[in-house]
Amino acid sequence: AEALPLASESIDLVFSSLAVQWCARPEHQFAELARVLRPGGCCVFTSLGPDTLCELRAAWAAVDSHQHVNTFLPMAELAAAARRIPGIAVNLERQVLPMAYTQVRDLLDELKALGAHNMNRDSRPGLTSRRALQGMLQAYEAGRREGVLPATYDVIFCFFFKA
C-alpha cells in the first residue's frame, strides 16, 4: 500500500481489509492512496487498534518483558496521518469486538493460520521456550469467564474521500 503499481488518479474506489496496519508509515500509505484515487474517489479500509488482543498481551506480560503481540496505531494517529494529506476528507470509527475461545491454543492456531506474525522490533529473538509458553497459557486461563476465554479485536474503520 506504500507503493501501488497503479497510475495516478486511475481508481474510483479502494477497499482494504486488515492490511493497512502492516505498513510502517501511514502518512506515506495515505499519500499513495490519495495519488491513485480519482477526484471524488473513496478509500474504505479496516485496521486494528491498540486494544487488539489485549488479553494475550497481558498474559505474555505476566511471563516476561518482551513484546510478543503486535502493537497497532491508535485511531487518533491514523486520523492525524490522513489529515496531513492535502485534498482528503477523512472519517474514522472504532468498534471493539469481543471474541470467545474455549482454549488459548484455538486463538493461537487461528492467528497462525491468518499469517499474523510478531512484527515488533523489540520482540524476543529466537524461539519461545516451552516454559514461557506454559506460563502465558496459565496467565491467559486466569481470564476465563463463564467457560470461555476472551480475545478483543479493536477494529478501526476508515473512510476517506478525495476532493
Task: Name these PLM-found stretches.
Residues 2-14:
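A short acidic, Gly/Pro-enriched loop at the edge of an enzyme's catalytic core
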Residues 11, 28-30, 58-61, 105-106:
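Short, glycine/charged-enriched secondary-structure capping and boundary segments
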Residues 12-27, 47:
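A short SAM/SAH-binding and catalytic strip from SAM-dependent methyltransferases
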Residues 27-42:
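A short glycine-rich, Lys/Arg-flanked "PGG" loop and its adjoining helix->strand segment in the class I
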Residues 38-104, 117-125:
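Conserved catalytic/acceptor-binding region of the Class I
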Residues 89-163:
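Conserved Class I S-adenosyl-L-methionine
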